Amino acid sequence: MKGLIARFIAGFALLLWAWDMVFPWQQLMQAEENRYNQIQQRKILRVGMVNHPLSYFIGAEGTAGIEYELAKSFANYLDVRLDIKTFDNSEQLFSALKDNKVDIAAAGLLYQPELSKQFQIGSAYYSASWQVVYKKGSNRPYKLSELEGDLIIPAGSAVLPILQRLKEDNPKLSWQTTNQFTQEELLLQVAEGKIPYTVGVSVDISAAQHIRPNIAVGFDLTDEAPVLWYLPNSSYSELQAAVLDFMNHANETGLISRIEEKYFNHLAHFDYVDIQSYLKAIKLVLPKYQSLFEKYCGDLEWQMLAAIAYQESHWDPNATSPTGVRGMMMLTRDTAERMKITDRTSAEQSIRAGSEYLHMLMRQIPETVPKEDRIWYGLAAYNMGLGHLLDVRRLTRQLGGNPDNWLDVKKNLPLLAEKRHYSGLKYGYARGFEAFQYVENIRRYYSSIINHQRVEEQQIQNNEEQPSVPQEISKESDSTLKE
């Protein structure tokens, strides 16, 4: 992220070499069996993870998450099977790594000097920081001394050693830990005013703000640091070298960029008013039309079709634009006639026709485009026309990019409005910058629906099963993590 990935990978390669020079592992544990050889012999790579809405989760289409996709690719790189082992928190995960129960710890873990003394480290694949959050509208803290209450932290959190270190210079700093709530749940409780503050990783906070925009960042608790894998402390470096080689390969082939695009890029834009309006519409308007989205979604998830409709009309079946498009899916008169609908203001007819038209466009996209990216090509065509989509593919090829790579195509969409580019294209000028934003908005709306539903279901369970927050937290200001 922020253009640091390549520099982190190169920098950490140098750091790992220097670390081995200072601490010659071969003198530490001569009798130890080679972990890399163990993986190859058993043909299984054991990776420890923590359930998390960005790193590792089971979604509607199966297992997903940044860490899962990277680990799966690494297992394929080694030609072994991936075995995911899940843990409740980082403390349990690192304990399992010490006890040889997993080969790699992968859970959105930031680099910490203390941990690098206990474990080998892999190379970075993005960067983040720990941040203190508070409820928007309440007094904003700008530094630790301005906190008007305790930080509430999940038990076993990776931030605890950092807090213990900061307490040396800030003796009044105090926090409480809870075994009952995850980091995401604590972020939501801050938004609801149930607790004053918590600490989260910057990318997690960005994701949470799209379902609870009242979450606000007070200040950075740490500088931005690389996110990486941790490996067992070992006298051998083959596994560490394999991870480094794989991450270089993943960077060079665009795998890391594709994962970043899938999970992060749509989070970059945050509009408090827009998100507030959208979340209100999810609660009050979406239930009226959800059954229609489910009925006509076809090969798409119904939440994706709903996100498209919100981008088009804010779920208003009577919406009209100055250009003459109308209805829930904002269809032109020609498209309506083509899709055989008689009333563009009928929510059902509009949703059915819009879905069928999008599916028709997607079927005309070249088969060389990967399955997971076809929806983005289809949406761009839905917005500006199939001809202009084919034009931007040609332009992407002319500029040395890959027309089957959505990242390459997306960045060239705005060029369709520049004369030096569109003058040589078959279909000429197009408002490609609008198509770019159109797709990004839908990605964001889709993600918000998915996460909003997940959080609502989780909170219903919590309200039924769990007592109030004060009964579930314990004072931990003087505690230390178990070694």
Swiss-Prot record:
State where the protein is found.
Cell outer membrane
> Catalysed reaction per UniProt?
Exolytic cleavage of the (1->4)-beta-glycosidic linkage between N-acetylmuramic acid (MurNAc) and N-acetylglucosamine (GlcNAc) residues in peptidoglycan, from either the reducing or the non-reducing ends of the peptidoglycan chains, with concomitant formation of a 1,6-anhydrobond in the MurNAc residue
InterPro entries xref list: Lysozyme-like_dom_sf (IPR023346), MltF (IPR023703), Solute-binding_3/MltF_N (IPR001638), Transglyc_AS (IPR000189), Transglycosylase_SLT_dom_1 (IPR008258)
How is this protein positioned relative to the membrane? Peripheral membrane protein
Keyword Membrane in annotation: yes
Residue ranges of region Disordered? 458-483
Q: What is its EC number?
A: 4.2.2.n1
Q: Which Gene3D superfamilies match?
A: 1.10.530.10, Periplasmic binding protein-like II
Q: Which residues form the signal peptide?
A: 1-18
Q: Where is this region: Non-LT domain?
A: 19-267
Region entry LT domain, spans: 269-483
The domain of life is Bacteria
Keywords, in A-Z order: Cell outer membrane, Cell wall biogenesis/degradation, Lyase, Membrane, Signal
The Basic and acidic residues compositionally biased stretches are 473-483
Pfam families per UniProt: SBP_bac_3 (PF00497), SLT (PF01464)
One GO term in the molecular function aspect is: peptidoglycan lytic transglycosylase activity
Please give the biological process terms from Gene Ontology that the record holds. cell wall macromolecule catabolic process; cell wall organization; peptidoglycan catabolic process
Keyword check for Transcription: no
Active site annotation, chain numbering: 312
HAMAP family linked to this entry: MltF
Per the record, the similarity remark reads:
In the N-terminal section; belongs to the bacterial solute-binding protein 3 family.
Give a short account of what the protein does.
Murein-degrading enzyme that degrades murein glycan strands and insoluble, high-molecular weight murein sacculi, with the concomitant formation of a 1,6-anhydromuramoyl product. Lytic transglycosylases (LTs) play an integral role in the metabolism of the peptidoglycan (PG) sacculus. Their lytic action creates space within the PG sacculus to allow for its expansion as well as for the insertion of various structures such as secretion systems and flagella.
Question: What domain comment accompanies this record?
Answer: The N-terminal domain does not have lytic activity and probably modulates enzymatic activity. The C-terminal domain is the catalytic active domain.
Name of the protein in its database record: Membrane-bound lytic murein transglycosylase F
Annotated organism of origin: Actinobacillus pleuropneumoniae serotype 5b (strain L20)
What is the taxonomic lineage of the source species?
Bacteria, Pseudomonadati, Pseudomonadota, Gammaproteobacteria, Pasteurellales
